[in-house]
Amino acid sequence: MTVTDIDPRLARFEPGVRGAARDLWRRLRQGELGSIPVVLGLIAVWIYFQSANSNFLSSGNLTNLMLQIASFGTISVGVVLVLLLGEIDLSVGYVSGLAGATMAVLNVKSDWPAVWAIVAGLAVGAGIGLLQGLWVTKLRVPSFVVTLAGFLAWQGALLHVLGSTGSINVTDETITDLAGTFYSDAVGWTLAAIAIGLTVLGVIRRRRRSQAAGLVGVPLREDLFKVVVVSVGAIVAVAVFNDDRGVPLAGLIFLGFVLVTDFLTRRTVFGRHIYAVGGNAEAARRAGIRVDRVRTVVFVLASTMAAAGGILAASRVLAANQSSGGGDILLNSIAAAVIGGTSLFGGRGSAWSALLGALVIGSIANGMDLIGQKSDIKFMVTGAVLLLAATIDAVSRRGRLASGRA
């Protein structure tokens, strides 16, 4: 092979620190670093706040952090699905509040069993998602407009459901236990063992299938790295939680939504259709994908997860009131998805984005409170982090377009 036959991409590499920096910038522009920037950012946030307040990484505070992010993190998982389509849902905040209020009213005022009241709250979310999804797909009204209208309408519905009192206290143990249950040490270690075992079995199964099909699979070192990360993460998390009150049920519910959504998007035909529609809707339609159905189902899933987040929030504060679903819930839910690595332009991201982004936002808010910073500083810092994440996303998209991979 002559010099002119060398791949031009290889010719750009330079030895030394300067070459490594240029290669890092190239990979960042083309979106090849995955979740690494988010993880490094999270580590930096934790190091800073731990140095500012030694209680930040204590088991008690980390348990509180998980409880704080479980609600809007669950909402953010649904937001990830909508963003994967290249759409937006501005109504998820008040959908969560309305679902929590519906559950509280039915349980407290109408004496519904807690389980059925929870199911009704989830059904309200699913129904709203179906309505908004059909409005977007059948009437061709942009999702921004439809869900902005929903933002206003569901806020009004929340006030109507609560009535003149404006607040309903929740005392049923089935509901309050959602955020108040902590599992024993034995249960925690069992869950960690299950997580590690399933990861190992998944890696072995995938490698065997690749070998049987004669395909070149993922390098062994990457699979080993995945197993190590999951193992260390599970062991450390359980050890931290067990040092306090135990593994929180609310955190498991949030993680459950992440895992189920990750399986849906990566392991099912419907999940591949979501990425296809988000990448190029017209190409997906010509390939035979029922684009409108995919969009409608995603809006239903997003609103249902918003309802679940609202129910968790009501369980944590032991009430549903006029501020439920308001404040910074919507912005935190969207920001978590974007900061975690989900593209605003559609077609790129994962359910794990919600977890990573929620940890970043929750850590900033929690750390600011510990060091006594006021809300104004907290919001400005969170806004700066969101702007940085959106900028990286835009730069990465331009890099992929330039390289013909978008």
Role assignments for model-derived ranges:
Residues 111-152, 357, 361:
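Alpha-helical transmembrane segments within multi-pass membrane transporters and channels
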Residues 205-221, 260-299:
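Membrane-helix/interface signature in polytopic inner-membrane proteins
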